[in-house]
Structure formats: C-alpha cells, structure tokens
Amino acid sequence: MPQVKVKEGEPFDVALRRFKRGCEKAGILSEVRRREQYEKPTQERKRKRAAAVKRHLKKLQREQLARKRLY
C-alpha cells in the first residue's frame, strides 16, 4: 500500500495526487478490478496468452518501423 507523508504547508490536493500516482504505479486499482469477478483458470490463461501475442505483434511492428526509418 503506497504511503504519502504530507509535508508541512503542502496542499491536500498535491498529497492526494501523489497518493493516486503511487496507487497507480503499484497496480492496486487494476488488481481490484481484476478480482471483482472470479475468472476460471482457463480463461485467465487465454487472456494472458492473448496479451502476450498482442505485445509480441506490437514489438514486431515497432522493429519494422525502426528498420524503415533507417533507409
């Protein structure tokens, strides 16, 4: 759980923004959303496999674009 120490004279809004950023970096909200409903192990594997394929295709696309720029 992210912790934020409020500095003297620091506005509440700034401290809240730092806390939200810390939560986002820690992945707390995405974890909560993911656990809202039970996901079967097969569905989880399928989702992770699809995400891996998507990452791989995105990486290939970036590499091809980088090669194009060289010429």
Curated annotation (Swiss-Prot):
Keyword annotations of the record: Ribonucleoprotein, Ribosomal protein
Gene3D superfamilies reported for this sequence: Ribosomal protein S8
GO MF, one annotated term: structural constituent of ribosome
InterPro entries: Ribosomal_bS21, Ribosomal_bS21_CS, Ribosomal_bS21_sf
GO biological process per UniProt: translation
Transmembrane segment boundaries: none
Pfam families according to UniProt: Ribosomal_S21 (PF01165)
Family matches, as PROSITE patterns: RIBOSOMAL_S21
HAMAP family: Ribosomal_bS21
Name of the protein: Small ribosomal subunit protein bS21
